[in-house]
């Protein structure tokens, strides 16, 4: 016999607001877990719009474009937590959030691999002169020679900053035969 966990506040009374195109999967996940008052808006809201919208919100999900200053937090009388679905939390006034008792969390590894792949992709694009060749091809000129085109293999890559992203760039670069 399984028992349903008793919460201190009924899930169906908790209001959740997601901004900036937070994934539909997140909305579905919350709804599947009994949270019925979940709204998702496509973009970031201005400070004035946030003040109008946030009064009955218990959980706010944002990305990097939405800014939550003290004035917005003062209007957020029911807010319990802000989920920043991005690397940092610098868009939230953390001191004001702490004074208001609002928990702020982020997703520090959410795009680490994506950024590392873009770095490697940009390196390939530049070393192979893809922008020049693409421009020429669109002008009807096919540059068939390989002069000035190189491979990443054997090249040396210097990484400034060896945090989450830098270490992932290193893994990908080494897999391509680069010296890091």
Placement of each model-derived feature along the sequence:
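Alpha-helical segments flanking ligand/cofactor-binding loops in enzyme cores
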Residues: 28, 51-52, 70, 74, ...
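Rossmann-fold NAD(P)-dependent oxidoreductase module
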Residues: 29, 118, 122, 168, ...
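N-terminal glycine-/charge-rich "phosphate-binding" loop or analogous flexible N-terminal tail
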Residues: 1-57
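Phosphate/diphosphate ligand-binding glycine-rich loop within oxidoreductases
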Residues: 39, 57-136, 146-153
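Rossmann-like dinucleotide/phosphate-binding beta-alpha-beta segment
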Residues: 9, 145-180
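Short beta->alpha connector loops
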Residues: 21-23, 42-45, 64-67, 87-89, ...
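Residues at the C-terminal ends
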Residues: 32, 55, 97-99, 175
